[in-house]
Amino acid sequence: MKTFTAKPETVKRDWYVVDADGKTLGRLATEIARRLRGKHKAEYTPHVDTGDYIIVLNAEKVAVTGHKRTDKVYYRHTGHVGGIKQATFEEMIARSPERVIEIAVKGMLPKGPLGRAMYRKLKVYAGAEHNHAAQQPQVLDI
């Protein structure tokens, strides 16, 4: 018997919608990353993108535990000398709530071309509306 290897052209990808309202950021991000990679499927193959599309709604209502709302700091660099910028979790949620979930999930995906392809299947929205009704996404309860 030969070992099964998934082929990119035969992978069936489903669309799922997840409501982030009241969910803990890290626990939500790990399950999203797992499904983007395709590890929940029997035909998972490490070197093939077998994951599904994930739509995340209500990113502005995601929860964190402890004092992370005020103490957690996100760093980024402009590329210029002395150009390090920082923002707390509260500031990030106020400015662009989608980025909080995107950063958390991206850090859990593989680094490289395959990881970037998986990341492109993540769609995050601050509110409860999305424009992917044509894909008929199924509700995923995490």
Curated annotation (Swiss-Prot):
It comes from the Bacteria. Coiled coil: none annotated. GO terms for cellular component: cytosolic large ribosomal subunit. GO terms for molecular function: mRNA binding; structural constituent of ribosome. Keywords: Ribonucleoprotein, Ribosomal protein. InterPro entries: Ribosomal_uL13, Ribosomal_uL13_bac-type, Ribosomal_uL13_CS, Ribosomal_uL13_sf. One of its GO terms (biological process) is negative regulation of translation. PROSITE patterns: RIBOSOMAL_L13 (PS00783). This protein is one of the early assembly proteins of the 50S ribosomal subunit, although it is not seen to bind rRNA by itself. It is important during the early stages of 50S assembly. PANTHER family: LARGE RIBOSOMAL SUBUNIT PROTEIN UL13M, RIBOSOMAL PROTEIN L13. Belongs to the universal ribosomal protein uL13 family. Part of the 50S ribosomal subunit. This is Large ribosomal subunit protein uL13. It comes from Proteus mirabilis (strain HI4320). The gene is rplM.
